Amino acid sequence: MTVLKIISWNVNGLRAVHRKGFLKWFMEEKPDILCLQEIKAAPEQLPRKLRHVEGYRSFFTPAERKGYSGVAMYTKVPPSSLREGFGVERFDTEGRIQIADFDDFLLYNIYFPNGKMSEERLKYKLEFYDAFLEDVNRERDSGRNVIICGDFNTAHREIDLARPKENSNVSGFLPVERAWIDKFIENGYVDTFRMFNSDPGQYTWWSYRTRARERNVGWRLDYFFVNEEFKGKVKRSWILSDVMGSDHCPIGLEIEL
């Protein structure tokens, strides 16, 4: 039996978090796979030591727009293939999608859109959700096991944010967004963190504006999901809430293969 440790983190700028000790943390944590969201850089804008980390293969999927969005993956064992989109141009150009084939499972590293900016962006977010669900269902229905990680930009239930009442009309906790997560789960996917932890006060994002983190006024926006058939392989799912450097903290998953 092999235990695989996967970490997911919205770093809110890879160059910024690098200046705050990212590589030291990475080398101490030693995940088998590290998925990053919101890297805000193309590979050529990154220092060499971020592009080439000893013992890892790295894959960068930047947005076409400079300094925006983008996802990355560092992995000890290279995937047999890596797909960077759903085949829908308006979603695939924003650097939000990596789908890596590790033979035993497909790993989706996704930075889901934020719907706060405008009605138009909320519509884009919901359409992105549906394109993702269609893609992951197709893979799962063909017999693949899947792990989905990343920043979903939505808190699912009242337990998943500190102030649900005040935020019921705010994107990130709108009924329509929460209903999509319900639908996702009904399609046969499991929120792995809630397999192990049913406590309130468990968050992964805190606003920079109001010293929210020291008061733990946060939201749980980052998730590891697996398909129902694969959940027996999940040994642990946790939040690394003491890791600083971004407005999000990392989350972890251990699976036994």
Swiss-Prot record:
Cofactor note: Can also use Mn(2+), Co(2+) and Ni(2+).
InterPro entries referenced in this protein's UniProt entry, alphabetically: AP_endonuc_1, AP_endonuclease_F1_BS, Endo/exonu/phosph_ase_sf, Endo/exonuclease/phosphatase
This protein's record includes keyword DNA repair: yes
Transmembrane spans: none
Active site: 151
Superkingdom assignment: Archaea
UniProtKB keywords: DNA damage, DNA repair, DNA-binding, Hydrolase, Lyase, Magnesium, Metal-binding
Any GO molecular function: endonuclease activity
Catalytic reactions on record: 2'-deoxyribonucleotide-(2'-deoxyribose 5'-phosphate)-2'-deoxyribonucleotide-DNA = a 3'-end 2'-deoxyribonucleotide-(2,3-dehydro-2,3-deoxyribose 5'-phosphate)-DNA + a 5'-end 5'-phospho-2'-deoxyribonucleoside-DNA + H(+); Exonucleolytic cleavage in the 3'- to 5'-direction to yield nucleoside 5'-phosphates
Family annotation (Pfam families): Exo_endo_phos
Biological processes per GO annotation: base-excision repair
Residues at which Mg(2+) 1 binds: 12, 38
The protein's required cofactors: Mg(2+)
EC number: 4.2.99.18, 3.1.11.2
Record-listed Mg(2+) 2 binding positions: 151, 153, 248
Mutant lacking the gene: phenotype: Depletion leads to the loss of DNA-U repair.
Keyword set includes Endoplasmic reticulum: no
Family: Belongs to the DNA repair enzymes AP/exoA family.
Additional comment: The insertion of the side chain of Arg-209 into the DNA helical base stack seems to be crucial for the uridine recognition.
Its biological purpose: Involved in DNA uracil repair. Recognizes DNA uracil residues within double-stranded DNA and initiates DNA-U repair by endonucleotic incision on the 5'-side of the 2'-d-uridine residue, irrespective of the nature of the opposing nucleotide. In addition, acts as an apurinic/apyrimidinic (AP) endonuclease hydrolyzing the DNA phosphodiester backbone immediately at the 5'-side of AP sites, and as a 3'-5' exonuclease. Strongly binds to double-stranded DNA.
Protein name: DNA uridine endonuclease
Organism field: Methanothermobacter thermautotrophicus (strain ATCC 29096 / DSM 1053 / JCM 10044 / NBRC 100330 / Delta H) (Methanobacterium thermoautotrophicum)
